[in-house]
Amino acid sequence: MNGLSVTELCCLFCCPPCPGRIAAKLAFLPPEPTYSLVPEPEPGPGGAGAAPSGNLRALAGTPGRWKLHLMERADFQYSQRELDTIEVFLTKSSRGNRISCMYVRCVPGARYTVFFSHGNAVDLGQMSSFYIGLGTRINCNIFSYDYSGYGVSSGKPSEKNLYADIDAAWQALRTRYGISPDSIVLYGQSIGTVPTVDLASRYECAAVVLHSPLTSGMRVAFPDTKKTYCFDAFPNIEKVSKITSPVLIIHGTEDEVIDFSHGLALYERCPKAVEPLWVEGAGHNDIELYSQYLERLRRFISQELPSQRA
């Protein structure tokens, strides 16, 4: 779409869409769940075990122990030994939804934990292999969560739920594992950059990585949009300037879903941006396949962050 017709302009300004409708049309494609959480027996009088696995809603937010069960669709690439490094639990958002969380201990004693907000058409089961591979290669542990309506998280996906979901996951990571903000690298991919930018604009952390980010929902739907309207959704462009932590922006020059111009615009608007990574020829879903992706992440986390703290 190269511009807005008179009819489209009339529709926008006479009957503007609400942000929730823009968000729903642009972003949310939750897959069929590729995993389940199985409660592990808790010691108790008479050897009482855990509640039935179907009782997830009632147990959301409790400190019970859970075991990850991956379905074949998750396409897990590692052995049982690696699977055993994955801890899963449930927490509850301020909007009342059960949020599924995952902590992957890739590197004992790792300096940083990457807090990963994933893309729009995957869940934790599908991402688990990637998290193990990423963490071991960049020497970090990985924490992630599923948005409302994804995986075993309850509720429906929405912009408001995105913000509540990441808040709940942030608090769970900090309280459950005692990890301080200066040891957390917030990482958002695609739609995951929306909650990541929102959280990073409100809390300081070690660093932020924005992978194939969008400036706003309207700018994705209508590329010639130059300003942020009150009915826009996902207004990253209005929040990124409030981030006080170092920000690495990664984008493919041939991104067919979120145009490369979005990454450029956010880079220009972000006062804390470091040297970006523009991956020549990469699209929306294949940046990780290029060697410079891991090289840039390693340099950012192992060299640039420690030097900034010195």
Curated annotation (Swiss-Prot):
Subcellular location(s) per record: Cell membrane; Endosome membrane; Cell projection, Dendritic spine; Postsynaptic density membrane
Q: Which residues form the active site?
A: 190, 255, 284
The record's Gene Ontology biological-process terms are: regulation of postsynapse organization
PTM sites of type Phosphoserine: 307
InterPro entries for the chain: AB_hydrolase_fold (IPR029058), Hydrolase_4 (IPR022742)
Main localization of the protein? Answer: membrane
What is the protein's membrane topology class?
Lipid-anchor
> Its catalytic activity?
S-hexadecanoyl-L-cysteinyl-[protein] + H2O = L-cysteinyl-[protein] + hexadecanoate + H(+)
- The answer to whether the entry has keyword Lipoprotein is yes
Could you confirm whether the keyword Flavoprotein appears in this record? no
Q: What is its EC number?
A: 3.1.2.22
For molecular function, the Gene Ontology terms on record are: palmitoyl-(protein) hydrolase activity
* Gene3D superfamilies xref list: alpha/beta hydrolase
Consult the record and explain the modifications the protein receives after translation: Palmitoylated on cysteine residues located in a cysteine cluster at the N-terminus which promotes membrane localization. Palmitoylation is required for post-synaptic localization and for depalmitoylating activity towards DLG4/PSD95.
**What are the record's GO terms for cellular component?**
dendritic spine; endosome membrane; plasma membrane; postsynaptic density membrane
Top-level class of the enzyme under EC nomenclature: hydrolase
- PANTHER family of this UniProt entry? ALPHA/BETA HYDROLASE DOMAIN-CONTAINING PROTEIN, ALPHA_BETA HYDROLASE DOMAIN-CONTAINING PROTEIN 17A
Write out the function statement from the record.
Hydrolyzes fatty acids from S-acylated cysteine residues in proteins. Has depalmitoylating activity towards NRAS. Has depalmitoylating activity towards DLG4/PSD95. May have depalmitoylating activity towards MAP6.
- What is the similarity comment for this entry? Belongs to the AB hydrolase superfamily. ABHD17 family.
* The protein, known as: Alpha/beta hydrolase domain-containing protein 17A
Query: Where does this protein come from, organism-wise?
Result: Bos taurus (Bovine)
Q: Which gene encodes it?
A: ABHD17A
